[in-house]
Amino acid sequence: MYARVTTFPGLAPERIKATLEEFTEHHLPRLEQAPGYRGVWVGVDYPGGRAIAVTYWETNDALHASDALANEMRAAAVTKAGVDRNRPPITDRYEMVLEKHSAAV
Protein backbone atom coordinates (compact mmCIF):
# COMPACT_ATOMS: atom_id res chain seq x y z
CA MET A 1 0.00 0.00 0.00
CA TYR A 2 1.12 3.56 -0.72
CA ALA A 3 0.11 6.91 0.75
CA ARG A 4 0.09 10.55 -0.21
CA VAL A 5 0.40 12.77 2.87
CA THR A 6 -0.43 16.45 2.53
CA THR A 7 -0.08 18.89 5.39
CA PHE A 8 -1.92 22.19 5.21
CA PRO A 9 -0.35 24.81 7.51
CA GLY A 10 -1.63 28.37 7.61
CA LEU A 11 -5.37 27.67 7.23
CA ALA A 12 -7.97 30.23 8.21
CA PRO A 13 -9.56 28.40 11.20
CA GLU A 14 -13.00 29.84 10.52
CA ARG A 15 -12.99 28.34 6.99
CA ILE A 16 -11.87 24.79 7.80
CA LYS A 17 -15.36 23.30 8.33
CA ALA A 18 -16.66 24.72 5.03
CA THR A 19 -13.58 23.36 3.27
CA LEU A 20 -14.19 19.88 4.72
CA GLU A 21 -17.84 20.02 3.65
CA GLU A 22 -16.84 20.93 0.09
CA PHE A 23 -14.28 18.12 0.03
CA THR A 24 -16.81 15.58 1.31
CA GLU A 25 -19.59 16.63 -1.06
CA HIS A 26 -17.70 17.42 -4.27
CA HIS A 27 -14.24 15.87 -4.25
CA LEU A 28 -14.50 12.67 -2.19
CA PRO A 29 -16.90 10.95 -4.63
CA ARG A 30 -14.39 11.48 -7.46
CA LEU A 31 -11.54 10.28 -5.28
CA GLU A 32 -13.46 7.11 -4.40
CA GLN A 33 -13.80 6.31 -8.12
CA ALA A 34 -10.06 6.58 -8.80
CA PRO A 35 -8.43 3.24 -9.70
CA GLY A 36 -6.48 1.80 -6.79
CA TYR A 37 -7.97 4.15 -4.17
CA ARG A 38 -8.18 2.51 -0.72
CA GLY A 39 -9.14 5.28 1.71
CA VAL A 40 -8.52 8.68 3.25
CA TRP A 41 -7.90 10.09 6.71
CA VAL A 42 -8.15 13.80 7.50
CA GLY A 43 -7.00 15.35 10.77
CA VAL A 44 -7.59 18.95 11.81
CA ASP A 45 -6.08 21.30 14.40
CA TYR A 46 -8.78 23.98 14.38
CA PRO A 47 -7.14 26.45 16.80
CA GLY A 48 -3.77 26.09 15.07
CA GLY A 49 -5.21 26.42 11.57
CA ARG A 50 -3.65 23.18 10.35
CA ALA A 51 -4.83 19.99 8.68
CA ILE A 52 -3.37 16.77 7.35
CA ALA A 53 -4.85 14.53 4.64
CA VAL A 54 -3.63 11.01 3.98
CA THR A 55 -4.88 9.06 0.96
CA TYR A 56 -4.12 5.36 0.58
CA TRP A 57 -3.47 3.59 -2.72
CA GLU A 58 -3.17 -0.06 -3.68
CA THR A 59 -0.03 0.43 -5.81
CA ASN A 60 2.63 3.03 -6.43
CA ASP A 61 1.32 3.32 -10.00
CA ALA A 62 -2.19 4.09 -8.71
CA LEU A 63 -0.74 6.70 -6.35
CA HIS A 64 1.09 8.47 -9.17
CA ALA A 65 -1.83 8.10 -11.60
CA SER A 66 -3.95 10.09 -9.12
CA ASP A 67 -1.51 13.04 -9.01
CA ALA A 68 -3.59 15.27 -11.31
CA LEU A 69 -6.73 14.67 -9.25
CA ALA A 70 -4.80 15.31 -6.02
CA ASN A 71 -3.38 18.55 -7.42
CA GLU A 72 -6.87 19.71 -8.38
CA MET A 73 -8.33 18.89 -4.96
CA ARG A 74 -5.41 20.54 -3.16
CA ALA A 75 -5.83 23.73 -5.21
CA ALA A 76 -9.55 23.79 -4.40
CA ALA A 77 -8.81 23.35 -0.69
CA VAL A 78 -6.23 26.13 -0.74
CA THR A 79 -8.74 28.50 -2.35
CA LYS A 80 -11.66 27.55 -0.09
CA ALA A 81 -9.66 27.49 3.16
CA GLY A 82 -7.83 30.76 2.64
CA VAL A 83 -4.34 29.30 2.97
CA ASP A 84 -1.56 31.72 3.89
CA ARG A 85 0.44 31.99 0.63
CA ASN A 86 3.67 32.03 2.65
CA ARG A 87 2.79 28.60 4.11
CA PRO A 88 1.68 26.40 1.18
CA PRO A 89 0.68 22.74 1.55
CA ILE A 90 3.44 20.15 1.64
CA THR A 91 2.94 16.77 -0.05
CA ASP A 92 4.99 13.62 0.45
CA ARG A 93 4.56 10.04 -0.76
CA TYR A 94 5.31 6.88 1.20
CA GLU A 95 5.24 3.13 0.88
CA MET A 96 3.28 1.84 3.86
CA VAL A 97 5.25 -0.97 5.50
CA LEU A 98 3.42 -1.54 8.80
CA GLU A 99 -0.21 -1.41 9.86
CA LYS A 100 -1.29 -2.33 13.38
CA HIS A 101 -4.61 -1.67 15.06
CA SER A 102 -5.47 -2.28 18.68
CA ALA A 103 -7.68 -5.23 19.51
CA ALA A 104 -11.34 -4.52 20.22
CA VAL A 105 -12.14 -4.29 23.92
Describe the function of each predicted region:
Residues 1-52, 58-72, 79-105:
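Short S/T/G/P-rich N-terminal loop/turn motif that feeds into the first structured element of a domain
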